[in-house]
Amino acid sequence: MGLCVRSSINIPYFHYAMIYLDNMGRLKVMESPSIQEQNETVFTTEVRERFLEILGAKVGYQPPMVRSIYDPQQPLGCLSYRQTKRDRNSPAHSMYGVPPSVQFSAPVEESPSCGSVDMVGLEIGDTPNVLDYYERSLKHFRQVNCRQILKTFIKFIEPRKQAKHPYNGGKPPAGAPPGKKGDPEKTKPEWWPANVVHKEPDHLRKDRTCNPSENLQCQVTLLTDLERLSLLIHIIRRLGRFGITTDQLQEIAHDCKRRLSDPHKLQILDEVFRVRRIEERYERGEVDANKIVYVVNRESNQKEKDGDSNVDPDQKHEQEDDNAREALPILHSEKNSTSPMSNSAEHTGMAAPSRPMNMGGDRNQLFPLPEWPSFGETPQDDRIFFPTTSKYTEDYASQQMPRTPATTALVSTNETHAAFDYMTQESITSSSPEQTSHHRQAPLPMQHSASLDPWTPTFRHNFFNPMVYSTAPRHAMSQATMLSQFPRSTTSHGQEMPHMAHGLPNLPQDRPSSMDGMSMRGPSFRTGFLSHPCDPSQQAPHSSGCGHPDSWTQNRPHV
């Protein structure tokens, strides 16, 4: 409840309530804070109307012509709207199924308004101002409520409208070409206004086009909403000759109160119907054109004004859906133009890393070498994934991100060696301290069995990432040179291992002689055939080795 309007009158009491008319003829109320704390008001709508009725001719107020069920002057033969619904097909009814003598017989339930109401006078003979009042009041009633009320009114006025007056224009005329639809304007009922297109109230805002060069979308939306308001005002004011009375429309509006977004706004329609009754008296010549009707000045309270009266929430969702449909081709083209790496990242459900590698002067190298992992840091904390961008597409275009078989998560380039080549040790090609200190050696993360040779060359072929040697001749030759510098004998290898600076433990020297050949075979793995391991000694000198640590069993005689 809003705060009361204070006046210059100083009331020396703690509890009070006052109703008055100011110098402008506006109805005002004032209540003490003790009453306002209860979120209620003493001056309900009935009290305010009674106050104006008592003043009567002094303020030019006429009581509303609403008959209630407890009115002793109501005729006994009067029937309500609910009683006449079952008798619509009776011959006594008019052509639109409503008898003109039906009276409004149910009491209108009105919620109490706030403690302070600003009311203004409306001259009933000033038709443009009266029409403007109808339009402004229905805007505060909200468009979503207007659609609901309109559908209920149309169903009451024309119960079989889809059969008699379809919105789609009905069947096309005889001899029409295939695909031609009927004209909705030709099936428009007689009571429908001529300046409103024959559309269902939910679709009056559609089927409007404008010049794309002119930004008139908001104006087009406003015009369609005005058409809906024009249809509602026409039904309220111009259907008396078809047997539709204001009392019937008011009762129908209260019947669909629960379907409104804000049932309390129904009091706006009650005031509209009250003004319409006085306007009917003016049309019949019962009152003069100077008759003043006091209505609520809703424009003075901007908080009550519906900011979405012109564009309701349903219309906003439909506009967003239309914009989304227009954006689909753009998104589809952008998706097709992305790099292969971004597509692979989207396929695995993870974002590709967009952080550049620090490659120094070798930025043009086709196969950039990642930095060696430092176990003094926590690599997991540095795993930051960002959405893929095309900024570094040139650096990552020829590099495939490795993926473990057990998970679909991508491994960053800084963790490639730590994730797959954890047993790989850097070869020492020179004894100069500048070259040896350039590479950081990583200790063996776990103790392996003595039956396996823990030493593997640096350039071990990664079967997860096939490499085309023709694209990087300089890199391939440098790795082959490094391989040729290692001795192939088991004696030299066993003697040099304790003196290497790679941090490997001193393995037992008393291993079986049948396993000495393992040091000459390099990296080994199965080719997929369990009974036929591949011997790397039968391959080319610089090709990647294949086989299995148990491949020494092939020297045994077959049974």
Swiss-Prot record:
Q: Which domain of life is it from?
A: Eukaryota
Question: Which InterPro entries is this protein grouped with?
Answer: AFUB_07903/YDR124W-like_hel, AFUB_079030/YDR124W-like
Q: Where is the composition biased (Low complexity)?
A: 169-179
Q: Region (Disordered): which ranges?
A: 163-190, 298-351, 427-451, 525-559
GO BP term, example: cell adhesion
Query: What Pfam families does UniProt report for this protein, alphabetically?
Result: AFUB_07903_YDR124W_hel
- Composition-biased stretches (Polar residues): 336-346
Entry keywords, A to Z? Cell adhesion, Virulence
Q: What induces it?
A: Expression is regulated by the hypoxia responsive morphology factor A (hrmA).
Sequence ranges of Basic and acidic residues compositional bias: 180-189, 300-325
Name the job this protein performs. Part of the subtelomeric hrmA-associated cluster (HAC) containing genes that alter the hyphal surface (such as reduced total chitin or increased beta-glucan exposure) and perturb inter-hyphal interactions within the developing biofilms, resulting in a loss of vertically aligned polarized growing filaments. Consequently, this hypoxia-typic morphotype (called H-MORPH) with altered biofilm architecture leads to increased hypoxia fitness, increased host inflammation, rapid disease progression, and mortality in a murine model of invasive aspergillosis.
Q: What is this protein called?
A: Subtelomeric hrmA-associated cluster protein AFUA_5G14920
Which organism encodes this protein? Aspergillus fumigatus (strain ATCC MYA-4609 / CBS 101355 / FGSC A1100 / Af293) (Neosartorya fumigata)
